């Protein structure tokens, strides 16, 4: 009888230990809650970032006069060093073919397309003359971070998260509308991962898979 009681006692201790271990393991996977910073705090954080790199997808959808839309899609890899005033941008087709390679330093731009090289100091104009694509890179480097490009730009913030949900901006004598959605935390900063950018009959859609931010 004593042996039977000892066995039951040992079994209870063993089960208690296993259950405690499961409870501890479960707690280790408890969800983390995001603390939303004020708009000023987020802008201050972004001001400390002097290098950034993103990877994702981009699509250009243009409504033509014949009412047929023209669509161009590519994967995008873009890195900027604001301190050194350099950047590199690559657009690649879904088949892995490099569509466009851009390298810039001190506002001097080199674009390589299909083995040919093109140079200039007006980047948006240079891209358009080569590819027919409207890519407002100067302003886009601000817009993607949810920052105004011009002092007259208007940023609309979410009342709950204090994050940009809409931005109205002026670039190249045109008004652009930028909408933000699906924020994720990268290097302790909430960054949008989906964008729609509109101007007249042009719609640019961007989905970012990964942000890399460096102080």
Where are these regions (language model features)?
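Sec-dependent bacterial lipoprotein signal peptides
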Residues: 1-24
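N-terminal leader/targeting segments and the immediate start of mature chains
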Residues: 22-77, 81
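Beta-strand-dominated lipid-handling architectures at cellular/organellar boundaries
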Residues: 55, 71, 84-85, 99-103, ...
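A mature extracytoplasmic/lumenal domain signature
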Residues: 58, 91-95, 104-106, 115, ...
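Extended lipid/amphipathic-ligand handling interfaces
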Residues: 76-80, 101-104, 180-185, 210
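An acidic-aromatic
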Residues: 86-134
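Solvent-exposed helix/loop surface patches that form functional interfaces
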Residues: 125-160
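Gly/Pro-enriched, hydrophobic low-complexity segments
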Residues: 146-215
